[in-house]
């Protein structure tokens, strides 16, 4: 593996470990960002289950004409994920930015999820 990949993998492990310590039984809102799309899941780490998920690749998102690689798509994914999580009875989560900087698409997704009813 290249040095950059190893560094990113270690950063991800470090972030997840600190989140597990501070979670207190709350599910984790995990974000994955690629160059073309953005994905988010609410995960219960104790059971190993995904409770809610949303991505910019879903039919609802693709029909709106967004590319998935911009801030508007991230906001739409955050709103959709929060609606699904609240419907499943989840109000509080721990935000796992996955080693990405809290800026741009990651920040837009988090803000939209907060506005739609999730607290973290």
UniProtKB/Swiss-Prot annotation:
Stored SUPFAM superfamilies: Translational machinery components
Specify the superkingdom. Answer: Bacteria
Lineage of the species this protein comes from: Bacteria, Pseudomonadati, Pseudomonadota, Alphaproteobacteria, Hyphomicrobiales
Organism of origin is: Bradyrhizobium sp. (strain BTAi1 / ATCC BAA-1182)
Please state what the protein is called.
Large ribosomal subunit protein uL18
Please, one GO biological process term? Answer: translation
Its assembly, as annotated, is:
Part of the 50S ribosomal subunit; part of the 5S rRNA/L5/L18/L25 subcomplex. Contacts the 5S and 23S rRNAs.
| HAMAP family registered for this protein in UniProt | Ribosomal_uL18_B
Q: Which residues form the signal peptide?
A: none
Instruction: Cite the PANTHER family for this sequence.
Output: 39S RIBOSOMAL PROTEIN L18, MITOCHONDRIAL (PTHR12899), LARGE RIBOSOMAL SUBUNIT PROTEIN UL18M (PTHR12899:SF3)
């Amino acid at each position: 593996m290249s040095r950059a990949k190893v560094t990113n993998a270690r950063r991800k492990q470090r972030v997840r470990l600190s989140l597990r310590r501070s979670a207190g039984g709350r599910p984790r809102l995990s974000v994955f960002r690629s160059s073309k799309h953005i994905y988010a899941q609410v995960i219960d780490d104790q059971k190993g289950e995904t409770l809610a998920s949303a991505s910019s690749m879903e039919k609802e998102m693709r029909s709106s004409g967004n590319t998935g690689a911009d801030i508007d798509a991230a906001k739409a994914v955050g709103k959709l994920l929060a609606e699904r999580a609240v419907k499943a009875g989840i109000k509080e989560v721990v935000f796992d930015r996955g080693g990405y900087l809290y800026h741009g698409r990651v920040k837009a997704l988090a803000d939209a999820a907060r506005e739609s009813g999730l607290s973290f």
